[in-house]
Amino acid sequence: LRCLVGSEMCIRDSNMAMQPFKMMVGDMVNEKQKGLAYSIQSFLCNAGSLAGYLFPFIFAAIGISNIAPKGVIPDSVIYSFYIGALILILCVIYTSVKVKEFPPEEYAAYHGITHESKKEKTNMFKLLVKAPKAFWTVGLVQFFCWAAFMFMWTYTNGTVALNVFDTPVITTMTNGVSRVVLDTQSAQYQTAGDWVGILFAVQAIGSVIWATIIPMIQNRKFAYVLSLVLGGIGFISIFFIHNQYALFASFILIGCAWAAMLALPFTILTNALTGGHMGTYLGLFNGTICVPQIVAASLGGIVLKMFTSPGSVAPEVNMLVLAGVFLIIGAGCVSIIKER
């Protein structure tokens, strides 16, 4: 329970720290440069992710314990969280001090906000009704993308443990029903967990590299489609790979999709917004990140059970294939986005 509460607080607080800066890009950067600005944000986010994945290995290498009793978090992970919190606080303070927002009058002139529109009373429901079409079409793409990555975060560990490290299985009894599951106490499972951390670091490297390439592609929708298709290929390829090092290629491709997801939706949406309420719209747009993850987390177990034959271990790799299919569907949905 404490782990769940802690995870929820980390996710919530990181969103609270990051979203205002996404809004500032929309407020302060002109339309021609927004794509580059959001790509720079994507680059920096993924560089931070890479550092976060590497910190536990660095601490273990310098002698800080990465082993702990059951139910206890290793010191290497604890210190990584401390360092991450310190970096977050320092970066937020630095950005808040150094970045000067537009004065209200200049902001209104820059965004074409009239005195009458500022007096207009509205609420979130009215804003949703008046939302530009891009809000909904990009949101549809977001649904498939974030559901796919929720599957990745949930099922990669089991997939790598079974398909790559040949983790042994055991039979358990739950409410009188026997189930065949992976032996999570085995050395193979622990090794797989460590390797997944490395794979996520490789994904971050792929994202960092691809974030520098996205601004070079003139057609934004083509860049979006290409990124998601590459990510979909990466997910589907995991089904055929049984070598731990070959998985690097899969996760580099997945990183391409991740880089685009952090940059292009916000570029397209903020270019479609005019006048005021940009901050409110971006806050509402955050729902296109949360809702698909909730749906994927709620229904993923049911779908996985449909893939599982009686007396056999759940084929979690099928969920990653489904994630790849979702990204390719999302790429297809990009075609209905109409940019302003």
Where are these regions (language model features)?
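C-terminal ends and interior cores of transmembrane alpha-helices
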Residues: 7, 230-242
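Helix-to-loop junctions at the C-terminal end of transmembrane segments
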Residues: 209-221, 304
